[in-house]
């Protein structure tokens, strides 16, 4: 254990700065970055993986800022809700989830049906249709006599007219299980709102609870009619499946309703509709008295009368908590666009600052899109951080530069190059100030973005990439090894001479080449 403790130890997160071998359409590789070039040539450096299972996401899925900062601060792989549920299905524990079993049993005892609703999509952003199939299987295995699916169609995280293919595949899965019927279909536009457009949510409610929609014999027939009317999946008008003119699967008293979206933001409103004791946005005609309402994950702490199949997992002994336990002080600094990431997400989803934790917020510029001002507020952020650390002796400083990600999202190559050059300049200023104070710096990123500005079809690439992030150490003689984002916190603890808690299963990536002097 190294006994030397640099002060301040500084973690700089370059949001959206990925490493990509190809220079073509790579704003990072083609920008003038004398400081980063020098460090990558002459200082200890390595790469950390930022996507897929390495950050708790499914294989091949790009990382994002929220996931990246969770892993950076936790010092362990933080499995996201999608992956938690998928892993539970793979290992069989999903079929024994007590919340699901109790909800199914409650419907059985009341003589009711089990209803599943959610985004029927393989997109993996809000839900996954394979997880809905698993829930059908669970309901069947536990004695549900009637199982109905209320399918919300995607078209945003999937191609705009792909629902026919996915519905066909889903119904083939139902046939193999010998259980479950699609009772209603509508585009996500009508139910998955998050901006209090209650007229849309009401149409989704009335479809499921009252059977108010255009009647069709099958889900695929409803989708084909929508395509014939030039509707895309997201905007498919509410449709109800009927037999002899009557809806086959309205939600009635005694039934159980299970929402199968793992992402919370777009099912909060519809969940409040079905469960709130008092509700003002619209009159809930025919509100069913449910045996149970299950949220796959936690959607909203204010929801009443709900059960949560996969509640949040509390993270203990994360980096910020370890600092507090040792009586050390910290500063978290970012401009508005990434402030929540270096605070809330870096702290494992905790809103309040920890003991000894100060925060510094610099306003992001008020422009329509950041290609109009690619420098953003990087210079002011650097000024404020230098001023703060020169007046207050912090032990740990965490700084996020938002430019590579926020300008990368615009898809404007020239602006992204300017953003990268701005960050390199400000990095030089910040690191000079820290080193002059006797501090050390660890530089990394949460995911890639500006490293690819044009896609394979020649159009603007505005999404994150799967590429690794740099890891650069400005300090003592040492070597760095490749790893993943969850290894950064253990590396910081090693650099600070602090023990790593058992809960952190990441590993330190630093190896000192000579003993430190206390």
Swiss-Prot record:
The active site is at residue 65. Substrate binds at residues 126, 156-157, 188, 194, 263-266, 338. The keyword GTP-binding does not apply. GO terms for cellular component: cytosol. Its cofactor is Mn(2+). It catalyses: (2R)-2-phosphoglycerate = (2R)-3-phosphoglycerate. Keywords: Glycolysis, Isomerase, Manganese, Metal-binding. Gene3D superfamilies: Alkaline Phosphatase, subunit A, BPG-independent phosphoglycerate mutase, domain B. Its EC number is 5.4.2.12. Catalyzes the interconversion of 2-phosphoglycerate and 3-phosphoglycerate. Monomer. This is 2,3-bisphosphoglycerate-independent phosphoglycerate mutase.
């Amino acid at each position: 254990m190294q006994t030397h403790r640099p002060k301040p130890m500084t973690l700089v997160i370059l949001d959206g700065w990925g490493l990509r071998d190809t220079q073509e359409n790579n704003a990072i590789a083609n920008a003038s970055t004398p400081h980063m070039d020098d460090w990558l040539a002459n200082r200890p450096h390595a790469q950390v993986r930022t996507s897929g299972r390495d950050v708790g996401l499914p294989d091949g899925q790009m990382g994002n800022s929220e996931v990246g900062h969770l892993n950076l601060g936790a010092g362990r792989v933080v499995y996201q809700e999608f992956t938690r549920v998928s892993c539970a299905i793979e290992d069989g524990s999903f079929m024994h989830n007590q919340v699901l079993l109790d909800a199914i049993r409650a419907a059985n005892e009341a003589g009711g049906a089990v209803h599943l609703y959610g985004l029927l999509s393989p997109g993996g952003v809000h839900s996954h249709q394979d997880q809905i199939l698993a829930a059908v299987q669970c309901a069947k295995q536990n004695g549900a006599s009637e199982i109905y699916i209320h399918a919300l169609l995607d078209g945003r995280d999937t191609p705009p007219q792909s629902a026919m293919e996915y519905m066909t595949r889903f119904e083939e899965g139902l046939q193999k299980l010998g259980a479950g019927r699609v009772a209603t279909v509508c585009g996500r536009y009508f139910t998955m709102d998050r901006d209090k457009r209650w007229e849309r949510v009401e149409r989704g409610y009335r479809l499921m609870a009252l059977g108010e929609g255009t009647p069709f014999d099958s889900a695929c027939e409803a989708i084909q009619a929508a395509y014939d009317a030039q509707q895309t999946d997201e905007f498919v008008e509410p449709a109800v499946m009927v037999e002899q003119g009557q809806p086959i699967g309205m939600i009635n008293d005694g039934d159980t309703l299970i929402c199968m979206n793992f992402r919370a933001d777009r099912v909060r409103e519809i969940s409040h509709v079905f469960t709130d004791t008092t509700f003002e946005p619209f009159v809930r005609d025919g509100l069913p008295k449910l045996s149970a309402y299950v949220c796959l994950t936690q959607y909203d702490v204010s929801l009443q009368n709900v059960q949560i199949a996969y509640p949040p997992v509390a993270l203990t002994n994360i980096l910020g908590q370890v600092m507090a336990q040792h009586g050390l002080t910290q500063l978290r600094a970012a401009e508005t666009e990434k402030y929540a990431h270096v605070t809330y997400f870096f702290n494992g989803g905790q809103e309040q600052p920890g003991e000894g934790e100060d925060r510094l917020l610099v306003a992001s510029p008020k422009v329509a899109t950041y290609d109009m001002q690619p420098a953003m507020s990087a210079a002011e952020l650097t000024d404020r951080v230098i001023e703060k650390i020169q007046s207050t002796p912090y032990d740990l400083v965490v700084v996020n530069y938002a430019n590579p990600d926020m300008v990368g999202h615009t898809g404007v190559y020239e602006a992204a190059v300017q953003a990268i050059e701005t960050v390199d300049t400000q990095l030089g200023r910040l690191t000079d100030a820290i080193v002059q104070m006797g501090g050390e710096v660890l530089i990394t990123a949460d995911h890639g973005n500006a490293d690819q500005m044009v896609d394979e079809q020649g159009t603007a690439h505005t999404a994150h990439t799967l590429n690794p992030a740099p890891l650069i150490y400005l300090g003592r003689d040492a070597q760095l090894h490749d790893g993943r984002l969850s290894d950064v916190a253990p590396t910081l603890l090693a650099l600070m001479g602090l023990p790593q808690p058992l809960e952190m299963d990441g590993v330190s990536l630093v190896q000192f080449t000579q003993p430190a002097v206390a």
